[in-house]
Amino acid sequence: MGAPYVLHMITPLANVSPFDVNMAVDAGIDTVVPYTGIETAQVEALTQDAMFSRDPKNAARTGLFIGGRNAAMALDMLDVACKAMFPPFRISVFADPSGAFTTAAAMVAAVERALRRLGVEGLTGLDVQVYGATGVVGGIAGLIAAQAGGNVTLVSHRGVSAVQGKAEEFGRRYGVTLSCADTSTGGKAALMERAEVVLACGKAGVTVLSADDLRAAKCLRVVADINAVPPAGVDGVGVQDDGAPLPAQPNAVGIGALAIGNVKFKVQHHLLERMQTGGTAVAFDFQDAMDAARTIAGKGK
C-alpha cells in the first residue's frame, strides 16, 4: 500500500475555501491541511518543508493547493513553489484561487462547445466582451479567451482603471492584448452592438446585462453567465441553459451557471485525481484547467 496522500492548502485569506476542501476529500485525498494568512514570501519554505519531510519515492504523494482571491498572486505563488523544488523531491502544485481558474476554463470551453453547435470553430477573430471583469474569474476568462484568439474587451463599471492594470499584467506575462472599457457612465449599447460573445462574470445576484442591452446587439452568438443567484447576471439566461435561445435575442444562445458549473466540477475533480494517480509530480494552472475543460466539454457535443 502506498503512502497516504497529503494536500497542503494555502491561502492569503483568513480561511481556505470549504468548496475546495470538499472537492479534495471527494477526489479521494486522505489528508487535507489548511494554512491561512500565507504570503508569497513564505511559499518557498512551506514547499520545502512539505517535500523534504517525505521519502523521495513518496514526494509525488504530496500536494500544495493555492487558493485566495488574486490570480496574479496565485500565479506568483505557483512560480515560487515550482522554483523551490528539485529532483528527487518534487511535489505537486495546483493553483485555483476562488475556483477562478477552473471556472473560467469551464466557461470558455462551454462557449466553444456552443459555437461548434452553431457551426463556428473557436473564438479566433470573434469580439469577446467580459462583464464583471474586475473580479478574479472575469480576468482569467478574458485571458483564456484572448489566448484562444478572441478579440477581448474587459468591461468595468467602476472606471477603466479597475481593469487596466489587470490587462497590462496579463499582457506582460502571456503576450496577449486585452482591451478595456468602462460602462459606469453608459456605453453598453455601443459595446453590445459589436459583441459576438459575452462572458458575464459579475457578482452573485447582480444583473450586468438587461434585455434592452441584449436587444442592442447586432451579431451576438453566445452569452455565458456564471451567476447562479437570482436575478440572473444576463436577463433571460437560465441557470441550467446550455445553448438555449435568448428571449431578447433569439439568434443568440445562453449558457447558465449550472451548465458551466458542471464542467468546472469535473475539471477540478479530474486535476485533483491526476495529482494523486500520475506517479510523478505535476503543476497545474489555468492553462491546464483549460486543456481539461476542452476535453470534458467536448464530450458533450
Locate the predicted segments by residue.
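Glycine-rich phosphate/diphosphate-binding loop of Rossmann-like nucleotide-binding domains
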Residues: 113-197
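Rossmann-like adenosine-cofactor binding region
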Residues: 176-254
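Gly/Ser/Thr-rich loops at beta-strand to alpha-helix junctions
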Residues: 14, 69-73, 99-103, 133-138, ...
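Conserved active-site and cofactor/substrate-binding residues in soluble primary-metabolism enzymes
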Residues: 38-41, 72-76, 102, 106, ...
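Glycine/charged-rich beta-loop-alpha catalytic/anionic-binding loops adjacent to active sites
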Residues: 86-94, 124, 249-251
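Adenosine-phosphate binding glycine-rich loop
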Residues: 2-3, 229-301
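N-terminal ligand-binding/catalytic initiation module
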Residues: 1-89, 287-301
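A glycine-rich, Thr/Ser-enriched phosphate-binding loop motif common to dinucleotide/cofactor-binding enzymes
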Residues: 95-113
